[in-house]
Regions:
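Hydrophobic membrane/lipid-contacting segments
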Residues: 2-195, 199-290
Length: 290
């Protein structure tokens, strides 16, 4: 049954419905939970289990009877491990990290007539700034940073012909929840968080496909692919790579109700179209044997 995705159920459905890939040459299915474990391993390798983001930024030029100045804000947030939630049919992932500790302070700095905030060049505890007291972030209000990050493909991370699917935080849309910095709008704070992630090249790899022609069988060499995310009747969230090899990209999506037999202990599956199996794998094997 669909609510008990066993290997037997999957094989019976594929036998009954025949061409279940709906025109795709191959489909890789991976459980969201398995990808999450992979992401957590990457997080540990990148951060040793602790991640701190810190920014110093300047506001616009202001005037007073004593001269021109700007407001300078600095913050430091220590983040907990990320949680990742894939969004069906949109190829985006929602990433949330709790702010487990942090501090902020603000001050003023004298500026001249040509001052530009983007090039103020301030550093943490900059001696040019008249600083106010350090204030701790109220972690009792459960502050978090949330990012909506697109799944994208980049080449060359592993070798020149490898296409790697990544979460690239430089393109993310960020929201900071339950944190208020004096004189700083929520949009300004979100922009500073995004700037930190872009500057620090924070990415997570999902999977890689090698487009080289090293395979003895061209029908098994990817030429194009696209993403798909589904939630099955049993509640499993599955990330799919819909792969084109020697055929043409299909317009639809696979019609397999439960592509991963989780009740039989599986966390992923690779499906190859019957066209390739019979025409390019079995026939090639028979011809080679003959």
């Amino acid at each position: 049954m669909a609510d008990s995705p066993t290997l037997t159920y999957l094989l019976n459905q594929m036998y009954q419905d025949k061409e279940v890939l709906n025109g795709w040459d191959a489909v890789l299915n991976v459980l969201e939970s398995a990808i999450n474990q992979f992401f957590q391993a990457q997080y540990q390798a990148k951060t040793s289990g602790q991640m701190t983001i810190a920014q110093v930024f300047c506001g616009p030029r202001l005037t007073s009877p004593h001269g021109a100045y700007c407001v300078v804000t600095q913050f430091s947030f220590t983040l907990g491990p990320p949680s990742f939630v894939f969004t069906g049919s949109s190829n985006t992932v929602t990433v949330t990290q709790a702010i487990v500790s942090g501090s902020t302070r603000s001050g003023s700095m004298d500026v001249d007539a040509g001052f530009q905030p983007a090039s103020c060049g301030c550093v943490p505890n900059d001696p040019r700034v008249t600083w106010g007291p350090v204030q701790s972030i109220d972690v009792g209000s459960n502050p978090t940073i949330t990012a909506i990050v697109q799944l994208t493909s980049v080449t060359g991370l592993i070798n020149p012909t490898t296409h790697t699917i990544v979460l690239d935080f430089a393109t993310g849309a960020f929201t900071v929840n339950n944190v208020t910095l004096q004189g700083v709008t929520s949009q300004q704070l979100s922009d500073q968080i995004k700037s930190w992630f872009a500057t620090n090249d924070m990415t997570y790899q999902v999977a890689s496909l090698d487009f080289s022609d090293g395979s003895s069988n061209p029908a098994l060499t990817p030429t194009q692919f696209q993403f798909n995310v589904i939630q099955t009747n049993s509640g499993n969230i599955i990330v799919q790579l819909l792969i084109t090899t020697n055929g043409s990209p299909a317009a639809g999506i696979p019609i397999v109700l439960e592509p991963i037999p989780t009740a039989s202990g599986y966390t992923c599956s690779l499906m190859i179209s019957s066209r390739i199996v019979f025409s390019n794998i079995l026939c090639a094997g028979f011809n080679a044997a003959g």
